[in-house]
Amino acid sequence: MLQPELKLRRDKIRSLMVSQGIDAALITCNANLIYTYGCVVSGYLYLPLHSPALLFFKRPNNITGEHSFPIRKPEQIVDILKEKGLPLPTKLMLEGDELPYTEYVRLAGLFPDAEVVNGTPLIRQARSVKTAIEIEMFRRSGMAHAKAYEQIPFAYYPGMTDIEFSIEIERLMRLQGCLGIFRVFGRSMEIFMGSVLTGDNAGYPSPYDFALGGRGLDPALPGGADKTPLKEGQSVM
């Protein structure tokens, strides 16, 4: 990820922090680390309002850089900030809607003199307005999808079930560069790659907050295809 792009994204968050009087953010969830650091790490990005972002990492252990610091536990973050002569925040934001309660309490406890607030809505607001590079990434993704969809009619053969058709579509997507992982927001939300529905299964309700339902293959993931045969004259979603 280009550093100017990361700075632009971080500054979008900072501008919203200013409006709420927040001095710093401590970011650790994967999607937000990708947004602010460019990749997933086991660790924390400390984003102060008026100085460069600092990465405190546990894994991988081969990260280098002026603003990167290896740690074994988050309690070391405060010690490093003090060693560097950096002021501790008076108002800190954490990813309150995403962190487990115990981790939220632990991270908040690192800064006992700070007011700790939920920063998830603020980060989501910053991410909702896409940068030029993000828009270009959408365009490239759309082109890859279009190439895969062009091949879908050729993946069908008579006698297929919905799950077999779904597997073939997934194969086409992977060949066009799909990583095969999908991140979804929400405590009880789960998602898999693609959803092919046909017949009565298309009207089967799902507990998930998605547009499509389906019985699925197992109660452990009640959604999507359920081995319904694809029949002539039936719609396929």
Identify what each model region corresponds to.
Residues 66-80:
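Short acidic-hydrophobic, aromatic-tinged amphipathic segments that line or gate anion-handling sites
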Residues 44-67:
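Short, compositionally biased "basic patch" segments
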Residues 48, 86-88, 195-237:
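Acidic/histidine-enriched ion/cofactor-binding microenvironments in catalytic or ligand-binding pockets
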Residues 27-28, 56-58, 71-74, 95, ...:
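Conserved beta-strand termini and adjacent loop/short-helix elements that scaffold enzyme active sites
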Residues 4-10, 79-204:
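Flexible, acidic/His-enriched mid-domain "rim/lid" segments that flank
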Residues 30-31, 55-62, 98-103:
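Short, polar loop motifs at secondary-structure junctions
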Residues 43, 127, 225-228:
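A generic local secondary-structure boundary/capping motif
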Residues 1-52, 88, 150, 154:
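Terminal domain-start leader segments
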